[in-house]
Design a protein with these regions (language model features):
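Hydrophobic transmembrane alpha-helix bundles
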Residues: 68-78, 135-140, 167-172
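Generic beta-strand structural signal
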Residues: 97-99, 131, 138-143, 149-153
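Glycine-rich adenosyl-nucleotide cofactor-binding module
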Residues: 149-172
Length: 172
């Protein structure tokens, strides 16, 4: 089973969702941020899902984040320690690579930490395992989305995620 956090331009999530529904008719979807962010759960494996999405060149879907781990949010300092532990657990993914960290939060999430604090905790864990935190030209991206219950954590390349900007933000 594959889980993805999917992002569209504000107001275009229904169209992005339809693009994915055509590719994965048996998938289930959960709204995270109305009109913009939703979660896809598909029966297919990660490589198959990412391959189909990239091959279809979606118009309305601007960013996808694989969910490799989902941690319950406790609302305390333990959340940052748990995030760092996941980074260390995924050391084979990041070791020796330039790695960007993207942190996004749903409005009203119980995750109490500032984006900068979460990024600092992840960057410190990356350094511990021999990865190089990077802002530009990353080889890998660690993405974290704090929703109403969980930290959704995943890793991939910019190509797999459709963008090297957090949530596929539009560049100006």
């Amino acid at each position: 089973m594959t889980r993805l956090v999917c992002t569209a331009n504000h107001g275009f999530a229904p169209y992005a969702l339809e693009e994915l529904r055509r590719l994965f008719p048996r998938a289930s979807f959960r709204l995270i941020v109305p009109g913009e962010v939703f979660e896809l759960s598909a029966e297919e494996g990660r490589e198959e899902v990412l391959g189909k999405i990239n091959a279809s060149e979606p118009i309305f879907l601007r960013h996808i984040q694989p969910v490799d781990r989902a941690l319950p949010i406790t609302g305390g300092a333990d959340d940052l320690a748990a995030l760092a532990a996941v980074v260390r657990d995924l050391s084979d993914t990041f070791r020796g690579r330039r790695t960007a960290v993207h942190i996004r939060r749903k409005e009203g999430t119980p995750f109490p930490h500032a984006v900068a604090d979460a990024k600092a905790a992840a960057d410190a864990a990356l350094r511990e395992i021999g990865a190089e935190p990077a802002m530009q030209s990353p080889e890998r991206i660690l993405s974290v989305f704090a929703d109403e219950e969980e930290l959704l954590i995943g890793a991939g390349t910019a190509e797999e995620m459709l963008s090297d900007w957090p949530g596929g933000a539009v560049r100006f």
